[in-house]
Amino acid sequence: MEREKSKFEVTMESNSSLQRFVKNKLAMSGLVFIFLMVLVSVFGSLLRLDKTENANDQKLSLALCKPGFSVNYVSKKFEENEWIPISKSEAIGDSIRVELFEKNGGGETVIFALSDLKKDSKGEVVSQKKFWLGTDKYGRDVLSRLMAGASVSLLVGTIAVLISLLLGVTLGLWAGYFKGWVDAVISYFIQVVWAIPTLLLVMAICFAFGTGFWKVFVAVGLTMWVEVARITRGQVLGIREKEYIEAAKAIGNSSSRIIFRHVLPNVLSPIIVMSAANFASAILMEAGLSFLGLGAQIPTPSWGNMIRESYSYLTTDMAYLAFLPGVCIMLLVLSFMMVGNGLRDALDVREN
């Protein structure tokens, strides 16, 4: 007679799965990169050069500067995150005369009172900024935009996966456990949604509800639940016939108790693996929508938006402006795929 595993057996299997996952170097490499991206997303506003909201501080005089470019600047008091790039400065008594920065020289000369300017940690009114990855066509720091874009990608992945789990697991559990007309209705609905191309469905939802930061995230999530529901249903159909499920029914346990206490814990492994894959798909989908102008809207930083703004430079020496966000998308998606493969191997999803 097949019985339900004891808590001790479950704990031992969990420890064994964790050990297998930790030994997987590719999976751990992906997990480390994801962890770094999470840190950048959470603490990015403190770390990046451009500390404005959305990293959208535009300085047209600094447009399309090369990586490693440095510029001196002065900042006025009582004007947060406001700074003025300069090329020359000269102290004149209680004032300072500066030449505003222009890439071709010949900037306007302006005189400021020293009492109106902020001082840095060294007590100097003239400071320096370094743009490690250069600036875009609006004079914004590329590195700051990339760091800010990481939070958008991780947020869309998180929201989309949560929505897909909420819908997919719920419908899959109902269809697999209750069978009959419930299974027939839900399966028919799944097949209808499954037949519609994902990108086309997302675009239809965006057109119906409008573009926007949160609307796009919800739209992506509403298109990713189908596969979760199919996998959950298939797993539940097998588990519901186990003898320990029949025993739970015989002693009078309610359907909800059986589903959440005995069925759901036994279908989590493939759902976890699917969630990692869905996370990667959501990031790719959001980037594609942003590139098409249907995703996160300007000035919200998005790697897809950055590629859209800079793809015209692909045949010039500024091609890195489109290449860098593309690399970020590739690395983050690859990391989630490696973690997903590691979870699949560690949890023995294929064998089970």
What are these regions (language model features)?
Residues T135-N352:
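Alpha-helical transmembrane segments of integral membrane proteins
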Residues M1-L165, V169, Y313-L314, M318-L334, ...:
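Gly/Trp-centered helix-boundary motif
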